[in-house]
């Protein structure tokens, strides 16, 4: 079996396409309640639990742009702070 890949944003638009199209990759789609990218301990827990070899970071806010304009702090938190947290954890776990 291929290496396990943790997909953040497992309920999002891109993850939905991956679920439909994927035929060969070993993907684990993390839901928000399993992997809160704003919480370092939440990210650590899922990594320790499923032991992925790769993280495919798909969590965050994207379109429509009105979402960002309506709540800019949420957009910054998810897209910048969340991504920074994923990067820190990847470095810590050598992923």
Model segments located where?
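Conserved Rossmann-fold NAD(P)-dependent oxidoreductase catalytic core, especially the SDR/UDP-sugar
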Residues: 84-95
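NAD(P)H-binding glycine-rich loop region in Rossmannoid oxidoreductase-like domains
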Residues: 40-78, 89
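Adenosine-cofactor binding site in Rossmann-like domains, unifying the SAM/SAH pocket
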Residues: 25-45
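Alpha-helix C-terminal capping segments
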Residues: 18-23, 27-30, 50
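Ser/Thr-centric signal marking residues that sit
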Residues: 8, 62, 83
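SDR active-site strand-loop-helix element
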Residues: 8, 30, 55-59
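N-terminal Rossmann NAD(P)H-binding glycine-rich loop of SDR-like oxidoreductase domains
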Residues: 2-23
